[in-house]
Amino acid sequence: NMAKKLNTDRKNVETISCCTEGLFQSMKILNIGRGDEVIIPSIHFIGAINAIKACGATPVFCDVEKDTLNTTSFYINEKITHKTKAVIILHYGGTPCDLDTIVRLCKQNDLKLIEDNANSPLSTYKGKHTGTIGDIGVWSFDSMKQIVMGDGGLIYCKDKNDIKNIQQESYLGLLSSSGFSISIDKKWWEFDVDRPGRRTIIN
């Protein structure tokens, strides 16, 4: 499975309907909302901008290197303000960003780091898989990607509790202990819901 491929714990990852859904979930997990800014490379897919705008935050575009089309800590640092809450980076075309300097910059400024691995499903940086180095990582498995399954995605969270929340919210807000997950002698037709949710599980 992908957790094994990424050399991470199964409890740190969850399949989702698409990479864009992972970015929407990331905004919610990190409590990003109105008045916040999220720095994002000027070369990126519209789904990431939609995720930022949908929660009321403002996307702030930073420049990229002309040879790799990846952003750098220098370009990110230029855009940091007191409103900045997170940074989304894209590992473009399988080439990882310089994560040492970007991770250091984010820690110095108390910023969350989201890695978009839509173009780099199994890329590594100094022996570690990209997407598992920041706070959150997202992958795409749609029909135009290197790993294809029609449509689908994966999300990694450093905090395993975040994955539990995603599992619940991606299946209509149902608690895992309710409904079809329990045996027939325990009222399988009863469902427990304690929050709103969407149906964004993988098909």
Where are these regions (language model features)?
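PLP-dependent aminotransferase-like
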Residues: 28-117, 121-124
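Active-site region of PLP-dependent enzymes
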Residues: 120-126, 133-203
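Short loop/turn motifs at secondary-structure junctions
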Residues: 9, 34, 83, 132-133, ...
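Phosphate-binding glycine-rich loop
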Residues: 1-37, 51-53, 61-63, 128
